[in-house]
């Protein structure tokens, strides 16, 4: 299934393009990945194609934070041929431009994502006032610290590099 359609969830074993952002309503003070917290460990989730996001690093970190499978959408043709066509939305999809980034991100996240694939979220905390430092605790005790800031941080005795993540393995 693609997207977050609640009516189809009982019949799905995979939700592709799970929403990564909040509704954007002005009533909320902080965005919390409720959809992923509620469904992770019940159904497999993937993010939208990372190379189609405005900020690829932030989207990658959101996938790590939520334990969602990484996804890219690629083509082999020259994307200039797609401008002003029905396929205009995939003009940033030439695989040659993304393969090295995808390999790097996948190799950094693979171990963690495999470890938490069937776990549920026990706790999700914003550790900084601006919400750029997040701690997620999984049901096996694994702690993931995600740093969206451009400065290194320390949390729970763990150093978390800028715009990266760190893992503290559970029992």
Region annotations inferred by a language model:
Residues 1-171:
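Active-site-proximal substrate-binding groove within the catalytic cores of carbohydrate-active enzymes
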């Amino acid at each position: 299934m693609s997207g977050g359609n609640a009516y189809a969830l009982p019949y799905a074993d995979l939700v592709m393009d799970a929403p990564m952002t909040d509704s954007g309503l002005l009533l909320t003070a902080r965005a919390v990945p409720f959809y992923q917290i509620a469904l992770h460990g019940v159904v497999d989730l993937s993010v939208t194609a990372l190379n189609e996001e405005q900020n690829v690093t932030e989207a990658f970190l959101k996938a790590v934070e939520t334990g969602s499978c990484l996804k890219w959408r690629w083509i082999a043709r020259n994307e200039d041929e797609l401008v002003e066509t029905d396929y205009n939305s995939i003009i940033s999809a030439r695989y040659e431009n993304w393969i090295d980034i995808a390999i790097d991100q996948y190799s950094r996240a693979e171990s963690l994502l495999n470890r938490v694939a069937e776990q549920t979220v026990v706790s999700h905390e914003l550790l900084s006032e601006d919400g750029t430092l997040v701690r997620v605790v999984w049901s096996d005790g694994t702690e993931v610290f995600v740093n969206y800031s451009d400065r290194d941080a320390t949390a729970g005795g763990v150093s978390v590099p800028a715009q990266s993540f760190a893992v503290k393995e559970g029992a």
